[in-house]
């Protein structure tokens, strides 16, 4: 039988909700042990507060940024972009947040992989962050390639470095974030035998670079897909995307069949 994770719907208590830079916020909440047991790549459906004058909306899917089972803590890193995240930005210490999760299928680390390369852009870096913690616990080396518009908008660098990861930053403003340069960086890591697998989130262009290298050089990988969702449980089918599975186009639900998928099967 396929593994079915435990899911809870509960009111978590906000511990902190602080700005990281001009665009991103770091939210920490106290929750149950079940919620705090979420794995890298999984997500929660958050019932965000409603800002004044905004229309009602559905729960917001949010990838796990960090967990602590011992302290029963759950962390999210989010960018304030719409009604949902504007509502999250209103939360202060002591407030309650309605959460449902952990949901979906997360990342899997093959015991044979000793060197991982994580490639992310924007909010995708939040999804990859828990991977660095788990990799360190298993004695696996991580090299992270972070992409952003400007250096001041790059997030999670300190977190990755605190877990022993090497971090390479590329940005639009410095003209270093283009696919050609990222491919050059990745080929260098491969030549140095520092890439047993790719892990990625946040950029279709960078996904295609990794797929091309993976296909040519036989390097496996996983991608966390970003998609709008309604239920988050696989019942409403609003998050369906097409995947190329052994030459056949197969429709899958990002929320329940993923959000983590085989790198080579994803269609940008």
Predicted regions: what is each one?
Residues 2, 251-268:
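Short, basic/aromatic-enriched C-terminal tail that caps enzymatic domains
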Residues 2-93:
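Ferredoxin-reductase
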Residues 83-230:
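FNR/FR-type flavoprotein reductase catalytic core
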Residues 227-259:
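Local cysteine-cluster metal-coordination motifs and their immediate loop/turn environment
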Residues 16, 66, 169-171, 223, ...:
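Structural signal for conserved beta-strand scaffold positions within catalytic alpha/beta enzyme cores
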